[in-house]
C-alpha cells in the first residue's frame, strides 16, 4: 500500500519572526500514523496545539494564521505548510517558542531543506488522499478559484498585477505537481511586498522582521533587491506556492485540477472549505500500490532515500 509519511528524526532551526522581528526556534518532530499536521506554541504554558484545519484558518494582511476556539493564534504557517504538501508529509508536530513560524527567506526552500535533513520515513498505515469528484468554484468579484476532477494534481494560476517590474508574459504559471517539480520550480519563489507598505507597517510596530532577506521588495517602478529575482516569473510562482500550502490545510494531498485567477489565501481557503462542505464533491481514497497512484504523488528518490 501507499503509506503515510513522517520524519525520521527531530530537526531544529532558528529564524526571525515576520511580525515581531525576534528570534524564533522551530522544532520539527516525527509523529505516529493518523496524527496529522499539528502546529504547537511552546511559548505558552501549557503549550497550545493547532491541528491544520481549513476551518481554523484566518487570513491577515501579512500572513495566514491558525486560530483556536479561545482566539489564540499561530501565524505565518503558509510556507512551511507548502513544504509539507510538496514532500507529502502526513504526520508531524511543528513546535515554535513564539506566536509565529519564522519567515526564513520568504520561500518554502529552507523548510524543504530542513525536512529532507530530518529524513522521511514511511509508516505502516495507508496514506489518505482527497479526490475531487465534482467541479467546485468560488468567486470574489473578478477573482475566482476552482477544482475539477482529474487523476493527478495540476495547478494553473494567473495573477494580474499592473506593475512595471512584473511583465505581462510572466503573470501565468501552470504545472503538473510532483515533489520534484515543487522543489525545483516552486519552493524557492519568495513572497513579495511594497517598500511603502513595509515602512508603514513598521512605523506602527508591525512587520518588524520584514526585510530584503525575507521578501522581494518593490517600489512603484522596480525590484529593489540587489540580487533581483530568482525566476523571471517569481511573483506568480510564489502565489502558486501559497496555494499549495493553503490547499494542504485539510491535511491531505488533493487529487484534482486547480485553476485560479487573482486568488489569494482567503479565496484558496474558501475553495477548500466549499469542497469539503459538499459531501458529493470529494472522497477519501487510498492506494494499494504504485501502479494505481497518480504520477503526481510518486515519491522521488530524494525524498525516500
Curated annotation (Swiss-Prot):
Pathway the protein contributes to: Glycolipid biosynthesis; lipid IV(A) biosynthesis; lipid IV(A) from (3R)-3-hydroxytetradecanoyl-[acyl-carrier-protein] and UDP-N-acetyl-alpha-D-glucosamine: step 2/6
Protein origin, superkingdom: Bacteria
Cellular component annotations (GO), alphabetically ordered: membrane
Listed EC numbers: 3.5.1.108
Reaction equations catalysed: a UDP-3-O-[(3R)-3-hydroxyacyl]-N-acetyl-alpha-D-glucosamine + H2O = a UDP-3-O-[(3R)-3-hydroxyacyl]-alpha-D-glucosamine + acetate
Annotated GO biological process: lipid A biosynthetic process
A Pfam family assignment: LpxC
GO molecular function, one term: UDP-3-O-acyl-N-acetylglucosamine deacetylase activity
Keyword Amino-acid biosynthesis included in the entry's annotation: no
Protein name in UniProt: UDP-3-O-acyl-N-acetylglucosamine deacetylase
UniProt organism field: Escherichia fergusonii (strain ATCC 35469 / DSM 13698 / CCUG 18766 / IAM 14443 / JCM 21226 / LMG 7866 / NBRC 102419 / NCTC 12128 / CDC 0568-73)
Lineage, opening ranks: Bacteria, Pseudomonadati, Pseudomonadota, Gammaproteobacteria, Enterobacterales
Amino acid at each position: 500500500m501507499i503509506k503515510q509519511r513522517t520524519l525520521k528524526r527531530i530537526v531544529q532551526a532558528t529564524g526571525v519572526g515576520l511580525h515581531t522581528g525576534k528570534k524564533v526556534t522551530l522544532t520539527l518532530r516525527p509523529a505516529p500514523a493518523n496524527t496529522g499536521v499539528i502546529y504547537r506554541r511552546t511559548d505558552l504554558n501549557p503549550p497550545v496545539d493547532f491541528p491544520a484545519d481549513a476551518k481554523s484558518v484566518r487570513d491577515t494582511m501579512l500572513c495566514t494564521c491558525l486560530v483556536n476556539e479561545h482566539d489564540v493564534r499561530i501565524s505565518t504557517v503558509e510556507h512551511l505548510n507548502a513544504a509539507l504538501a510538496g514532500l507529502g508529509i502526513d504526520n508531524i508536530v511543528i513546535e515554535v517558542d513564539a506566536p509565529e513560524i519564522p519567515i526564513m527567506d520568504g520561500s518554502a526552500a529552507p523548510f524543504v531543506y530542513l525536512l529532507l535533513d530530518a529524513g522521511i520515513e514511511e509508516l505502516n498505515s495507508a496514506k489518505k488522499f482527497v479526490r475531487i469528484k465534482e467541479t467546485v468554484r468560488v468567486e470574489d468579484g473578478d477573482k475566482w478559484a476552482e477544482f475539477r476532477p482529474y487523476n493527478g494534481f495540476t495547478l494553473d494560476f494567473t495573477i494580474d498585477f499592473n506593475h512595471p517590474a512584473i511583465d505581462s508574459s510572466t503573470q501565468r504559471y501552470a504545472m503538473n505537481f510532483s515533489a520534484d517539480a515543487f522543489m525545483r520550480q516552486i519552493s524557492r519563489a519568495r513572497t513579495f511586498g511594497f517598500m511603502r507598505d513595509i515602512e508603514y507597517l513598521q512605523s506602527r510596530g508591525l512587520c518588524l522582521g520584514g526585510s530584503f532577506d525575507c521578501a522581494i521588495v518593490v517600489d512603484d517602478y522596480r525590484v529593489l533587491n540587489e540580487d533581483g529575482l530568482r525566476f523571471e516569473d517569481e511573483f506568480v510562482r510564489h502565489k502558486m506556492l501559497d496555494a499549495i500550502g493553503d490547499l494542504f490545510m485539510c491535511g491531505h494531498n488533493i487529487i484534482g485540477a486547480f485553476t485560479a485567477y487573482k486568488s489569494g489565501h482567503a479565496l484558496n481557503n474558501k475553495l477548500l472549505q466549499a469542497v469539503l462542505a459538499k459531501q458529493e464533491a470529494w472522497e477519501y481514497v487510498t492506494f494499494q500500490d504504485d501502479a494505481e497512484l497518480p504520477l503526481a504523488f510518486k515519491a522521488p528518490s530524494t525524498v525516500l532515500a
